[in-house]
From Swiss-Prot:
Membrane topology: Multi-pass membrane protein
Role noted for this protein: May be involved in protein transport along the secretory pathway.
Keywords from the named record: Membrane, Protein transport, Transmembrane, Transmembrane helix, Transport
Taxonomic source organism: Dictyostelium discoideum (Social amoeba)
Transmembrane portions of the chain: 33-53, 61-81, 115-135, 136-156
Protein name: Protein RER1 homolog
Amino acid sequence: MPTTIDEGLPAPHNFVSFTTLIARKYQNLIEKTISFIPQRWAFVGFLSFLYILRVSLSSGGWYVITYALGIFLLTRFIAFLSPKWDPELEEDSGDSLPTTLNRNDDEAKPFIRRLPEFLFWHSIFKALFISIFCTFIPFLDLPVFWPILLLYFIIIFSVTMKKQIKHMIKYKYIPFTVGKKTYTKNNS
């Protein structure tokens, strides 16, 4: 009988079973963190601090890695702010059958995100972890003129956020909610 690792699982005999075991343990650990929202985001903040500290204290600039991380985080943030079903696309499709006779555009509709909060957090966590790892690989510190990357990122950020805010105003949705509104009984 092969030796066992914790939880009574058989010891891995080859690389595939070892990676499967690691993937299962990672998935189990990630799933245990679902209900700990403030702690998860605090850990992402800590990873961000570690990344900034690593980049600022190292001899290289890591400009390309930082730029790629910024662009990735921007795309994830836009997906987090976007509704799952784009009202602009639904408006254009005139071939579908109407579901109600009188359609009220002021009707309250729930906001469902294209990228849920947990997946948003998980993608940021993985991106920061990979970025920190990449700063330990010397050949990834490419020599670039960083002000151009910074200017380009600022332009991309401002254009995409302006477009997203206009979309939010046009279709009257607010992606930031704190939950269901509760009413209290007034004793006076």
